[in-house]
């Protein structure tokens, strides 16, 4: 059996060497010739997998180690009887950590209390749903927009217009859909952006085209009170340099790039392939994850909760490091800039998740205990 895989998928050998030969290629360079003789294709979001890539090949299973599937032509897969799997939720915690770190930075810049802001989460799937649970656990006011879940479940969902008009913070977590009943391409365009509240914060860690980047650039040129945090970009790895300069925080599509999340994505595709082949799993992710460099933090029960929140989040992740690295990589030469974008992702340093952090409290503090629980840490 021949497996063709994106070279940047972690733990390829550990999970897949027992199935046969593995050939690695840069994800953006995969073409029909590369996959012609493959039985299994393993990709990330940078590879468009469609008829043009697969027609005439032996591929019968496609696995993408990502949450999103907008790079997969699922209609063609159905026509060609090609099985597939994504990795839903694999990096959800990493994205939540990214958002929390960004909020802490913006709060310090504006001198505001996070607990006093109104949060709007657009898209309540694996990532957005987890973020909502964390924010609710912290006791913060959250409005949620998800028309698909609202139609299926009912509940206290609100419209996008309500989010834009009433929320101080908007965090986007939708898949990219260009058509259908609820398209998300340019979900936030000129009309929506013009309605942002004074001092609004906008975070996009979903897909670049969910926000009209040109319209956002024009808004930021006109309104210095608005903060934008962008991890995803229209046309990436090409980046609008002026827009990047106007963003308060900017990064190269790494919000979900925690070590745990990336390896969890590989593990989920391995499990799906085992089911497809009808074989038992022989490898477990828990046996492969290294011990975190920082495994435990100790807090006194008298610790200020706001300080504790910042300390715990930044003990695990601080987006300002990624922002600085990204800005240093930007270049007026489009070819150099695209290459730098991919290199930052390829050589991204190990980053763990807050759910792997143990917290010991000296004394009793129900408020701190609730904070740790909301973040997903473990009280010991």
UniProtKB/Swiss-Prot annotation:
Q: So where does substrate get bound?
A: 45, 66, 257
Q: Name one GO molecular function term.
A: 4-phosphoerythronate dehydrogenase activity
Tell me the superkingdom of the source. Bacteria
Compartments annotated for it: namely:
Cytoplasm
InterPro entries annotated for this entry?
D-isomer_2_OHA_DH_cat_dom, D-isomer_DH_CS, D-isomer_DH_NAD-bd, Erythronate-4-P_DHase, Erythronate-4-P_DHase_dimer, NAD(P)-bd_dom_sf, PdxB_dimer_sf
Q: What is its EC number?
A: 1.1.1.290
Print the keywords alphabetically.
Cytoplasm, NAD, Oxidoreductase, Pyridoxine biosynthesis
Q: Would the keyword NAD turn up in this protein's UniProt record?
A: yes
Q: Which residues form the active site?
A: 207, 236, 253
Q: What does this protein do?
A: Catalyzes the oxidation of erythronate-4-phosphate to 3-hydroxy-2-oxo-4-phosphonooxybutanoate.
Q: Which family does it belong to?
A: Belongs to the D-isomer specific 2-hydroxyacid dehydrogenase family. PdxB subfamily.
- Write the protein's name: Erythronate-4-phosphate dehydrogenase
Organism, as annotated: Pseudomonas putida (strain GB-1)
- Lineage, broadest ranks: Bacteria, Pseudomonadati, Pseudomonadota, Gammaproteobacteria, Pseudomonadales
């Amino acid at each position: 059996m021949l497996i063709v895989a994106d070279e940047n998928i972690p733990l390829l050998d550990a999970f897949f060497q027992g199935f046969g030969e593995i050939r690695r290629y840069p994800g953006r360079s995969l073409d029909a010739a590369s996959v012609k003789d493959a039985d299994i294709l393993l990709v990330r979001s940078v590879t468009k997998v469609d008829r043009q890539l697969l027609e005439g090949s032996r591929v019968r299973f496609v696995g993408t180690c990502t949450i999103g599937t907008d790079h997969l032509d699922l209609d063609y897969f159905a026509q060609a009887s090609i099985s597939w799997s994504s990795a839903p939720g694999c990096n959800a915690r990493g994205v939540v950590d990214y958002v929390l770190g960004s909020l802490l930075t913006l709060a310090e810049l504006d001198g505001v209390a996070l607990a006093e802001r109104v949060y709007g989460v657009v898209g309540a799937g694996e990532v957005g749903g987890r973020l909502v649970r964390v924010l609710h656990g912290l006791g913060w006011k959250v409005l949620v927009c998800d028309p698909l879940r609202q139609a299926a479940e009912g509940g206290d969902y609100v419209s996008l217009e309500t989010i834009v008009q009433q929320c101080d913070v908007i965090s986007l977590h939708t898949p990219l859909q260009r058509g259908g009943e609820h398209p998300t391409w340019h979900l936030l365009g000129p009309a929506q952006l013009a309605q942002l509240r004074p001092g609004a914060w906008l975070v996009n860690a979903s897909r670049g085209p969910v926000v009209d980047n040109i319209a956002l650039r024009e808004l930021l040129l006109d309104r210095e009170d608005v903060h934008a945090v962008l991890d995803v970009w229209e046309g990436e790895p090409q980046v609008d340099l002026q827009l990047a300069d106007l963003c308060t925080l900017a990064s190269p599509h790494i919000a979900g790039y925690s070590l745990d999340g990336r390896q969890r994505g590989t593990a989920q595709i391995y499990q799906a392939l085992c089911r497809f082949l009808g074989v038992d799993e022989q490898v477990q992710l828990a046996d492969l994850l290294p011990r975190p460099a920082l495994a435990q933090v100790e807090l006194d029960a008298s610790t200020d909760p706001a300080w504790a929140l910042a300390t715990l989040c930044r003990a695990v992740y601080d987006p300002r490091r990624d922002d600085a690295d990204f800005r240093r990589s930007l270049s007026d030469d489009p070819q150099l800039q695209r290459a730098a974008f991919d290199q930052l992702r390829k050589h991204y340093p190990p980053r763990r998740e807050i759910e792997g952090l143990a917290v010991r409290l000296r004394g009793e503090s129900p408020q701190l205990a609730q904070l740790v629980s909301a973040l997903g840490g473990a009280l010991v």
